[in-house]
Amino acid sequence: MKCKTLLIACLFGLGSAQALAVSKLPPQIPVHAGSGRVTLDLRPLLAETNDVEITRVSVCRRVGSHCQETLWRIELPPGWRAGEIEVFGDYPGSSVLLRRPERLQPDGSYNAFIHFNERSRRHRQTVSSIAVEFCLAGEPGNWMLLDEATCLARRNAEERQGEKP
């Protein structure tokens, strides 16, 4: 009887530990476009993560579901926690590894990758990056963002076009 009680207690404890180990998804990162600038709003990421620092951001031109060309890559200084980052911006203490602003075009599909360090309460690394998909329309210098459904339709059309011989 004691053995069964101990077994049940262990299983209950194991189930509780597994429930605590569930990771949560990173928040959505809003993208803003206008006046020839594209910015990523990092405030939701900073607000919903523990002791986070943004380490690297990159943007690539996407064709279908694959990155075809990297347009911008920046390494940010330790402890960087700004609430917003402008694509192709230059920030004090950062290293811009690649910058091709002329390749950011209307009617393009893009992914922004935000790499960060977040420490849990036990000082273990948890989630380390988030990808943000966005599509531009309009005229150069007067960009507009497409809604998610239109961007998804564009990605699917590009994917199908790439499959044809």
Swiss-Prot record:
Record keyword Signal present: yes
Phylogenetic classification of the source organism: Bacteria, Pseudomonadati, Pseudomonadota, Gammaproteobacteria, Pseudomonadales
Keywords, comma-separated and alphabetical: Periplasm, Signal
Protein's name in the database: Type VI lipase immunity protein Tli3
Disruption phenotype: Growth of mutants lacking this gene is affected in the presence of various P.aeruginosa attacker strains because mutants cannot resist Tle3 toxicity.
Annotated GO CC locations: periplasmic space
Protein's job: Immunity protein that neutralizes the toxicity of the P.aeruginosa antibacterial toxin Tle3 in the periplasm to protect the cell from fratricide intoxication.
Originating gene: tli3
Signal peptide (UniProt feature, chain positions): 1-21
Superkingdom in the source lineage: Bacteria
Quaternary structure and interacting proteins, as annotated: Interacts with the Tle3 toxin.
Organism name: Pseudomonas aeruginosa (strain ATCC 15692 / DSM 22644 / CIP 104116 / JCM 14847 / LMG 12228 / 1C / PRS 101 / PAO1)
Record localization: Periplasm
